[in-house]
Structure formats: C-alpha cells, structure tokens
Amino acid sequence: RTQLLLSAPNGGTPEQLYYGSRTSDADIRSICETARGRNAYPVYGMGYPCETALSVRHADGNLTLQMAVIGVKETRLTEENATLTVIELKDKVYPFFVNICYKAWQDADVIETWTEIRHEEKKPVQLQQFASAYLPVRRGNVWLAHLSGAWANEGQLCQEALQPGMKVIKNTDGVRNSQSAHAEVMFSLDGKPQENTGRVIGAALCYSGNYKLRIDTQEDDWHHFLAGINEENSWYNLKKEEVFRTPAL
C-alpha cells in the first residue's frame, strides 16, 4: 500500500511531504515536523526555477500567479470505496482559483489527481499551461519506462536512466495519440527495471487528445514530473465563472 502526505496550511503553499510505502503514525508525525515539502502544484510567476504546472495571462495582461490555500475538503465516497480530498487555492492578488483534487481508491491502491480552474476577473483569462498534476521523484538511480513506436510497430518498450535536463513525451496527432507514444510511464526507483523486484511508480493520463509528459531534472534533489494536455497551439480563453477541469492522472 502507498501513502501520499500533503501539507495545506491556511494562507500558505500546498506541499507534498511524502509519497511512498505506508508508514506508521509516528513516522507521519516525524515527516510532518521535519520534511521539506515540494510545492504540490507549482505555478509560473514568482521565482519558481523549474518547470511549472500552470501559467496564465490575466485579464489585465499580467502573467504572475501566487496561489495560497483557502480551504481543504474531504469527502468519503462510499459507493466507490474512495476518498476525495480537495485543496482549494486562491491567488493572493487576483480572483483566480484552483482546486487540486486527489481521489484515493482504497481497494486498488491508486491515487487519481486532477485540477479545477476558474476565475472571477472581468474579462477572460488565457490559460497558457495547465498540467493535470505534478509529482516530485527523489533523484537516485531512477529509470523511466515508456512506450514508443510507429505504424505497424506500436507499443515498443523503451527503458532509460533519467539524466539531467528535460525528458518530454508528447503527442500532437489528435485521435492517433497512441501510435508514436503513449501517455503512460513507469519510474523504477531502484535502478534498471527488474521483473520481480524493485519499487516502481506508475502514471497514466486519462485523456484521448494531445498530451505532454515532462520530466525536468535540474541541480536539485528531484526529478520533477508533470503531465497533462499538450498546450502547444492550444491556449484556452477561460470565461468568468467557467470551470476548466483537467484530465485525471
């Protein structure tokens, strides 16, 4: 079983503290007291040095975002045997809102995540980047497995060690979004993948259109994984009170 620990102080930045095997209550307390968290949904505009999940152009032309927690809601979905946790964010200057949603399936050991974006600005806000999710993966001997190919040769397994720089898996073919690549990856945390041993993290984007998966490895201690709709030539003008929901990862 896996476990995701989040910190969402009112007025502060939402952070991911831990993702991995289930821990004891004592370990959870220790992690919450000592862990240095990573921004749960990094946005563009306030000095964040790595790849961002969200960037926008406000109605007045400004590109800056600075999101803060305004609430947390948790709902038990009995019929689905799942728990839905929603971290509500608001920009510190603009009436711009983001909900980070986590749906934990208790019987499948799967955590589904997506975002819901809306605003109350006077004119439309242009969404220029809108990833579904962000996951930091601790650097080490981490390998990436993904599928590639071409016509009549689809689904070829590619395995590679993650190196400094950017790794991008994307599609711009529309309805043919699984011919040359797939929106699914698997991270092997203990070196080159083995059939019967080792820790892995799997991720699949539930989207039938153009997608982009990014892995940004810089000078810090993390591989920064982001996945969502491919925003190239696809900026979206979000109307006031309209809700833009990203596909689930």
Regions flagged by a language model, labelled:
Residues T2-D216, W222-H223, E232-W235:
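Polysaccharide-binding surfaces and accessory modules of carbohydrate-active proteins
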